[in-house]
């Protein structure tokens, strides 16, 4: 993977980009990344997955070359909604995933069924456990996925 991306400095931009770094094996540099708790929790989960993370001001360095842990827990794992963005990246790289159910939403109940249904159409299989979501995808494949309604997060 190669290229440049100007990150806007918002958590809603930074968190999916951080999760996407797991799709490649290399060192990724992200500029203008906000220093807020959700970003720090995501960095902790990337470290649990085996990444090396460094920060210089608002610049992040993510080294994903050694990432090999599919079970992503940690202090922030179940505390924020964006944990769900790790599902596809970890499945794509490691072919299995285990994460706590996402939390942290004060808006109200926000189901994750669109995320799961989309990944199932790509070949993933999920098992719902009491506190965690487990998934496997031996061979992911392309698919046309149609959402019941527009969803920025599910996209």
Task: Give the positions of each predicted feature.
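Structural preference for solvent-exposed beta-strand-turn elements
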Residues: 1-155
């Amino acid at each position: 993977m190669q290229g440049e991306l100007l990150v806007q400095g918002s958590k809603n931009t930074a968190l999916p980009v951080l999760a996407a770094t797991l799709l490649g094996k290399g060192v990724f540099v992200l500029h203008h990344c906000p220093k807020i708790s959700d970003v720090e929790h995501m960095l902790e989960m990337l470290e649990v997955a085996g990444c090396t993370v460094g920060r210089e001001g608002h610049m992040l360095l993510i080294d994903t070359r050694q990432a090999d842990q599919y079970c992503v827990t940690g202090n922030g794992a179940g505390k924020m909604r964006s944990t769900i963005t790790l599902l596809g990246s970890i499945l794509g790289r490691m072919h299995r995933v285990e994460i706590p159910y996402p939390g942290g939403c004060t808006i109200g109940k926000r189901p994750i069924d669109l995320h799961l249904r989309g990944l199932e159409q790509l070949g993933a299989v999920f098992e719902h456990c009491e506190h965690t979501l487990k998934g496997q995808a031996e061979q992911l494949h392309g698919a046309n996925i149609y959402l019941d309604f527009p969803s920025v997060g599910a996209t």
